[in-house]
Amino acid sequence: MVSKVSVTRRAGRVRRKLKAVATERPRLSVYRSSKHIYAQVIDDVKGHTLAAASSLDKDLREKLKTGADVDAAGVVGKLIAERAKKAGIDKVVFDRGPYIYHGRVKALADAAREGGLEF
């Protein structure tokens, strides 16, 4: 089992590299729980959330069988891309946090790219 310390370190390494690479772009942050997936576009300079989507949104809850599969992640990815575009954002930096770029995280990223976000 992975300890909380190693998960926190891994997330910190990822975020430190992101801040070094892209300071002017907002960050597309992903959180994955055992039952749902969440995504938000964050402006780190101001500390504001510009757009957010999750498998808990009322529109999606009725459509999705579960919030914990690859299909749900794809729908959330399309929704976050749509909301970010509406907020005037088209270029972001993808923050996978401590999660491996595989499965639900990859599905969300691919759907966000298809939706028009560039990262």
Swiss-Prot record:
A Pfam family annotated for this UniProt entry: Ribosomal_L18p
SUPFAM superfamilies according to UniProt: Translational machinery components
One of the GO biological process terms: translation
Cellular component per GO, a single term: cytosolic large ribosomal subunit
GO molecular function: 5S rRNA binding; structural constituent of ribosome
Highest rank taxon of the organism: Bacteria
Family recorded in the similarity comment: Belongs to the universal ribosomal protein uL18 family.
Function field: This is one of the proteins that bind and probably mediate the attachment of the 5S RNA into the large ribosomal subunit, where it forms part of the central protuberance.
Protein's UniProt name: Large ribosomal subunit protein uL18
